[in-house]
Amino acid sequence: MKPVDSLSGLSEHLSVHALCRRFGAFTALDQASLSIRKGEFVCLLGPSGCGKTTLLRLIAGLDLPDAGAIRLSGRDITRTAPAKRDYGIVFQSYALFPNLTVADNIAYGLTPRRDKAGHAHRVRELLDMVGLPGSEGKYPSQLSGGQQQRVALARALATSPGLLLLDEPLSALDARVRDKLREELKGLQRRLGVTTMMVTHDQEEALSIADRVVVMNAGRIEQTGTPAEIYRSPASRFVAEFVGDANWLPAERRGGREAAVGGCVLSLARDLPDAEALTLFIRPEDVIVKPRWAPAANTLLARVEDVSFGGAMTRLRLRPEGMPGLILRAEICPSMLNRQPLVPGEIVPVELPAAQLRAYPGEAAC
């Protein structure tokens, strides 16, 4: 299926065209093409080994492609030395100089070096920006992981680059610090308006922070779109499986928009793929548990197997009648349970809305 890019018609700041990178017989990046608008925040999302870090390294000039082209602000930088590309970069490991103070780390790339007063002013400005005022004289060893990453971000922004590259900058931090820095990073990027590309394998991180998400798999771009497009309208089976939780139902085609799952015939709001064997997909939060039975399209009975409280959502495991061997996962808000207490063994009506069902060719693997 062709990758979807809903913003491809807008003006671009960075573009890559048909980039390829091979390491012997292994293809790390295969014909990757992408366009990024000025001021946009884009996340490269995918499993380990999918090519996302390779793509970022090629853009940074830390590696060279075997084929393809990279353009930044209209300038071909495919073979340009890293120092002559207009970007700042933050690594997962911080990469701070342990023998230099915070101020000297941040000012390292500033020129001319003799302008000490100007550099000191810029350092103070950046430390205020990243929430570390008064830290100029400290050394990296005196800072927490989150503070070190703030210093690394300040250093990357010191030269006011047109492009900010982030290589999994939050993955080494604990969950609470990571969530806080994620919010700060998003707010800072919005205020500065700097074009940003971030590599991550954390789908929640990508969906919450990015203007657009680029999902990668096996060296190829599977889909490009807004977080909502990626989550609600996955362009391929891989994207649907990788981003978010899902129910997978093996089905057989019955007509243009009908498919049979066991003894149940379900309607879909869109045409089915041209295949007899199908897999239907629906998110757990889209499964509707009804308070009482009433005959309706895509509505069936299911036995409650398990009820698990999850804070904002309560998770259910349901065994639908007429679908032997299948378990449906549903997520409902606790307020619904206040009106309709559920216990294992109870039979409840369940609706699988036609608008939320999607079909992919082939039998379910999960």
From Swiss-Prot:
Q: Which PROSITE patterns match?
A: ABC_TRANSPORTER_1 (PS00211), ABC_TRANSPORTER_2 (PS50893), CYSA (PS51237)
Domain called ABC transporter: residue spans: 14-243
One GO cellular component this record assigns the protein to is: ATP-binding cassette (ABC) transporter complex
A Pfam cross-reference name: ABC_tran
Class in the EC hierarchy, top level = translocase
Q: Which InterPro entries match?
A: AAA+_ATPase, ABC_SmlMolc_Importer, ABC_transporter-like_ATP-bd, ABC_transporter-like_CS, AminoethylPonate_ABC_PhnT2, Mo/tungstate-bd_C_term_dom, P-loop_NTPase, Transp-assoc_OB_typ2
Signal sequence interval, chain numbering? none
- The record's EC number reads 7.3.2.3
Major location (coarse) = membrane
User: Its topology with respect to the membrane?
Assistant: Peripheral membrane protein
Subunit architecture: The complex is composed of two ATP-binding proteins (CysA), two transmembrane proteins (CysT and CysW) and a solute-binding protein (CysP).
Q: What does this protein do?
A: Part of the ABC transporter complex CysAWTP involved in sulfate/thiosulfate import. Responsible for energy coupling to the transport system.
Q: What is this protein called in UniProt?
A: Sulfate/thiosulfate import ATP-binding protein CysA 2
Origin organism is Chromobacterium violaceum (strain ATCC 12472 / DSM 30191 / JCM 1249 / CCUG 213 / NBRC 12614 / NCIMB 9131 / NCTC 9757 / MK)
